[in-house]
From Swiss-Prot:
Main subcellular location: other
Family: Belongs to the chibby family.
The name this protein goes by in its record: Sperm annulus positionning complex subunit Chibby3
Keywords: Cell projection, Cilium, Differentiation, Flagellum, Spermatogenesis
Domain of life: Eukaryota
Function according to Swiss-Prot or TrEMBL: Plays a key role in the correct positioning of the annulus, a septin-based ring strucure in the sperm flagellum, serving both as a physical barrier and a membrane diffusion barrier that separates the midpiece (MP) from the principal piece (PP). This positioning is essential for proper sperm motility and function. Interacts with CIBAR1 to form a complex which localizes to the curved membrane region of the flagellar pocket. By doing so, may provide stability and rigidity to the periannular membrane to prevent membrane deformation.
Gene label: Cby3
GO cellular component, one term: sperm annulus
Organism: Mus musculus (Mouse)
């Protein structure tokens, strides 16, 4: 009985599931596995399916491993490295002489600075600064050299109109600056008053009702800046 079972098992393993019936020759009794018949196609299909699944798992594992290696390499190449640019070359320290300690003539000779004489133009007339004075362009060192007493009356009438013209231009410029400063002061005072009113309206709860009543006069006078006498007194 045991021999027949072993023979039947060996036959099943060798043929991948195809069983063969064998009888016991020693006892002559019929084997209990004679009438058992197993289908021939089920075991090969199961084995083939198992082999296919194992192959697919191996293929998927290899592809996943390859993809994971690529991701890790991409991360190492682009994200894991610190930003370390190359250092620039060191500057060569050059020794410079202290030109600012030199006087004007030596510095001008060393650096080649030659700006020329200052020039300006007032009322369609050009002037040159020579010898500490503004003289009309074209006249040379006549004003620099001392003149005799006989030529002083003839020289004074020429310098007087020029000096008066320069002073007049300077006076007009100062007046213009004064007007500009007054306009800026007026605008600043008006803005300060508006800010004070806004702060008072935020602190006082009854202020919105009064500000609503003032909307109509403000709309009528839009574009016109009304300056109160207090702003002028502050100036």
């Amino acid at each position: 009985m045991a021999d027949s079972k072993m023979k039947w098992g060996q036959a099943w393993d060798s043929s991948l599931g195809t069983a063969t019936t064998s009888s016991s020759s020693a006892t002559g009794s019929p084997s209990p596995f004679q009438n058992i018949r197993v289908p021939d196609t089920r075991a090969p299909r199961v084995a083939h399916t198992t082999f296919t699944l194992e192959a697919f798992e191996c293929l998927a594992a290899s592809q996943a491993g390859r993809l994971w290696k690529q991701v890790r390499q991409f991360w190492v190449d682009h994200f894991s490295r610190r930003f370390s640019p190359r250092r620039p070359p060191l500057r060569h320290i050059s020794s410079m002489s202290t030109f600012y300690l030199l006087d004007h003539r030596t510095r001008q000779a060393e650096l080649g600075l030659n700006y020329g004489e200052p020039r300006t133009r007032l009322s369609d007339e050009a002037f040159v600064f020579r010898g500490g004075r503004w003289t009309p362009e074209g006249k040379r060192a006549s004003a620099r050299t001392p003149l005799p007493s006989s030529t002083i009356p003839a020289w004074k009438p020429q310098v007087q109109p020029i000096k008066s013209q320069v002073l007049l231009e300077e006076n007009n410029y100062l007046k213009l600056q004064q007007e500009l400063l007054m306009d800026m002061l007026t605008e600043t005072t008006a803005r300060m008053q508006l800010l004070e009113k806004k702060v008072d309206a935020d602190n006082n709860p009854a202020a919105p009702a009064r500000s609503w009543k003032r909307k109509m006069p403000k709309q009528r006078g839009a574009g016109v800046l009304i300056i109160q006498p207090r702003a002028l007194e502050s100036r």
